[in-house]
Amino acid sequence: MLAAVQRTDRKFSLTYRAAIQPNPLFQFLCASVIVFLSVGPGFAQSGASYTAQRRIDTITVDGNLNEASWFNALSTSVLTLWNGSPAPAALQTTAKLVWDDQYLFIGFNAQDSDVYATYGGRDPNCWEQDVFEVFVTVPGTTGYIEVECSPKGVIWDGYFTNVFQGLGGSYNLASLQVAGHVNGTLNNPTDSDLGFSGEIRLPFSDIYQGVSGGHPTNGTQLRLNLNRINWNTPATPGGLGAAGSDTYYAWSPVPGASVSFHRPANFGTVTFTTNSVPAPTWQFTGQTLADTNLVFSGSGHPGGTYWVLVATNASLAMASWT
């Protein structure tokens, strides 16, 4: 059996492990998720597009994205600045979406050299610190749910009957699960982090509340956006991030006179397919792994990351990978 570990350096070590499975560790950022629901004339459609496949194994929401479902799931394009301008190379953000009959799963990876998050509890002002967001709406409706996830896995969630109208943060999704994982140290601007990742399990019962159907079928579409707010750690951690350090990113750009992610007309479109995510496959030929500290170079992936494959016993051998 094998594990896969994401790295950003150009060399890595192979080690043996017992009882491991395909395990891509994404460097992900936690942010907030906004899901759009509606019952009315609906919002005009434009923006990015994505095809969500069905999961192939049980997803434990712990922020690590170490299930086989995540390994070969389609990746979104890199989030841009909110107005569509390219994001800085050091702040790249991507996400993957998979689903089953009950839940939409969203996994994300955010590069960040200074991860900042101090808030705890339920429904703090997560947008004042590093956070990941998702916006989703049922086509033909006008309501939406907003869920925010911090790098610590702290949740802010709310329901809106229309843009900025409704229950806001007083509404809690009963079956929502969110988790974050920091690849570095929180709230320490003196070192250099790699970023943070996160997983969100969003129940279709909340997305489709008041709408017939209950969950997607093959070809069903939802309107959705994925957003990130980045802050640097202030001199005294706690509360709002460092003044003037905030930047805003969106999968489907939301241009306007000022920053606002609450522009459903600019959301992207997610189309659901009943096709499952392809199972991970591995090819082992040639050199036998006989050393627990064998170092060699690997080929790069987009964004400067690549996967380290780890064999569980020396009888397996690897020649190359992609």
What spans do the regions from the language model cover?
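N-terminal secretory signal peptides that target proteins for export/translocation
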Residues: 1-25
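Extended rod-forming repeat segments used as scaffolds/tethers
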Residues: 13-18, 30, 34, 69
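Bacterial N-terminal signal peptides
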Residues: 24-39
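Sec/Tat signal peptide C-region and signal peptidase I cleavage site
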Residues: 40-44
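Structural preference for beta-rich elements and adjacent junctions enriched in aromatics
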Residues: 45-277
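Short, composition-biased motifs enriched in small/polar/acidic residues
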Residues: 277-322
